[in-house]
């Protein structure tokens, strides 16, 4: 029946314009329409109980309002329920049985135990290559290698236990867990990434809540957990925190963390050495599989095929999957639709760039960890200038602390200015009033000259106010200087514009999204 679906599409369109992108993508976008018995009824399916409860609590009344006033075919009855799921336990009897069945059915290769190695063979160093077909195996160049221990079939199966390492200094722990067949699972979790030292703010509180729930109830409703957001925002920290918590909760748990490119490299080598069954048995026998930067699967059809079956096997066995990505799953070009669909079966949460207060809290926490007193004014100064992500924030703090250490001075705003002068000078060149005006004009599809003009139509006045707000927020120019740059306006006009936009950011989702997008463009 098309009428309820048409009304829902109209409702979704309205909600998308009303809500911030993070809220819309997390709560509204995953909802699906189920066939209704009557034209005035609508049955929506939520992917899990968490989404169901949140939508009912926060958005149900607005959904009812929009659907009841839909054009031509109002909906008077709206029901939301949870999609039926298969296995939902971390270690259910069904999950264990399914895993044992897969292991028994997979033909065994000769597997020899060896000392852990970061490589597969003694071949020359080359990047990992996607394997399009078995007929091309001979052409594949392999990962760099150290001399491995002798293997019966030339295949170092322990290399599966050497995933992408985000901790090259060796601080991460590598936990081995023997499994049937001689393989060893190594978690490669960074022990410093735990929930206790994750700084929470508005930008990441949903991600933290979801990760905490997964750690307490792995393999449950939030499976898979898909965390997306820009670089350096804490996605990997949360992923490691869940893994570390699972290992504490269940000592000996087979928790494997790796980068998506490592999964590809393992599969390529397995294909070349005719050991694909070892590969399948290894990745499908874990308790939790944590894969970073899933967007690198894009365009790799053979890897996507194998991961698709691995994904299904793990969910069937009640084993937890956590994935991170730099964008919403539906926006990953080159990724099969069936994978995108499955990524939405659990819970999808976004991590946004931290707001000012969270950036200050992060700086204070990091400084405290290394025993460096950081005054509030210095912390706020750094946080106001470094906006894009936590990694850049930490990098700036390290420069400040090093400068204080080598000069024997206490940290102050003056010292921060000196330590970061190159970075601040670069920012001043990049974030100028002229640049702000150009970016805002392009964003709103108007001319820069319109921002200077006396025109007061809404299509020009609002972008002008946004540009003034950004100029005050991102530059050191005074209000009179900003007013002069916008057609010789009075400083009170600039002050009014800044106050107006600040209020609208709190109340208007469109303006809030516009300012967020413009800030991202101007500061990254």
From Swiss-Prot:
Can you list the GO cellular component terms from the UniProt entry?
cytoplasm; plasma membrane
Q: Where is this region: Domain I, interacts with DnaA modulators?
A: 1-73
Q: Which UniProt keywords apply?
A: ATP-binding, Cytoplasm, DNA replication, DNA-binding, Lipid-binding, Nucleotide-binding
Q: Where is this region: Domain II?
A: 73-187
Q: Per the record, where are the segments of Polar residues compositional bias? A: 86-95, 106-126, 153-165
GO process terms (BP) = DNA replication initiation; regulation of DNA replication
Q: Where is this region: Domain IV, binds dsDNA?
A: 405-524
Signal peptide bounds:
none
| Superkingdom field | Bacteria
Q: Where does ATP bind?
A: 232, 234-236
Sorted alphabetically, which HAMAP family does this protein's record hold? Answer: DnaA_bact (MF_00377)
| Family according to the record | Belongs to the DnaA family.
Q: How does it assemble?
A: Oligomerizes as a right-handed, spiral filament on DNA at oriC.
Its recorded name reads: Chromosomal replication initiator protein DnaA
């Amino acid at each position: 029946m098309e009428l309820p679906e048409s009304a829902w599409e109209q409702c979704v369109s309205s909600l998308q314009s009303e809500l911030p992108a993070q809220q819309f993508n997390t709560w509204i976008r995953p909802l699906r329409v189920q066939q209704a018995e009557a034209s005035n009824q609508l049955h929506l399916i939520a992917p899990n109980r968490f989404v169901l409860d949140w939508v009912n609590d926060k958005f149900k009344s607005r959904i009812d309002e929009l659907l009841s006033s839909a054009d031509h075919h109002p909906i008077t009855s709206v029901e939301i329920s949870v999609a039926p799921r298969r296995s939902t336990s971390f270690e259910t009897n069904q999950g264990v049985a399914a895993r044992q069945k897969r292991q028994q059915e997979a033909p065994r290769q000769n597997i020899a135990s060896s000392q852990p190695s970061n490589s597969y063979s003694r071949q020359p160093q080359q990047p990992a290559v996607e394997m399009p077909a078995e007929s091309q195996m001979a052409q594949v160049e392999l990962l760099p290698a150290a001399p491995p221990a002798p293997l019966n079939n030339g295949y170092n199966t322990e290399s599966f236990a050497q995933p992408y390492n985000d901790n090259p200094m060796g601080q991460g722990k590598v936990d081995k867990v023997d499994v049937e067949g001689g393989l060893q699972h190594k978690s490669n979790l960074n022990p410093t990434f735990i929930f206790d030292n994750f700084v929470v703010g508005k930008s990441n509180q949903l991600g933290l809540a979801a990760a905490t729930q997964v750690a307490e109830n792995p393999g449950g409703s939030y499976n898979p957990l898909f965390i997306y957001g820009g670089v350096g925002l804490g996605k990997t920290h949360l992923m490691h925190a869940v893994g570390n918590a699972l290992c504490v909760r269940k000592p000996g748990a087979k928790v494997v963390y790796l980068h998506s490119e490592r999964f590809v490299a393992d599969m390529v080598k397995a294909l070349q050495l005719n050991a694909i069954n070892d590969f399948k048995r290894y990745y499908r026998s874990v308790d939790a599989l944590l894969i970073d930067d899933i967007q690198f699967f894009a365009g790799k059809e053979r890897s996507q095929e194998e991961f698709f079956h691995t994904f299904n096997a793990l969910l069937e066995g009640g084993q937890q999957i956590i994935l991170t990505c730099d964008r919403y799953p539906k926006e990953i070009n080159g990724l099969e639709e069936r994978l995108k669909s499955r990524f939405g079966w659990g819970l999808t949460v976004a991590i946004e760039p931290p707001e000012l207060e969270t950036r200050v809290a992060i700086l204070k926490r990091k400084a405290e960890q290394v025993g460096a007193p950081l005054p509030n004014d210095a912390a706020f100064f750094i946080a106001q200038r470094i906006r894009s992500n936590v990694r850049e924030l930490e990098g700036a703090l390290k420069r400040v602390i090093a400068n204080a250490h080598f000069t024997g001075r206490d940290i102050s705003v003056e010292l921060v200015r000196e330590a970061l002068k190159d970075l601040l000078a670069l920012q001043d060149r990049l974030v100028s009033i002229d640049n702000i005006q150009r970016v805002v004009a392009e964003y709103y599809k108007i001319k820069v000259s319109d921002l200077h003009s006396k025109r007061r139509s809404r299509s020009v006045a609002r972008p002008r106010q946004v540009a003034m707000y950004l100029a005050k927020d991102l530059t050191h120019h005074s209000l009179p200087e900003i007013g002069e740059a916008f057609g010789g306006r009075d400083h009170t006009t600039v002050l009014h514009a800044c106050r107006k936009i600040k209020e609208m950011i709190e109340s208007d989702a469109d303006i809030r999204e516009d300012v967020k997008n413009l800030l991202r463009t101007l500061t990254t």
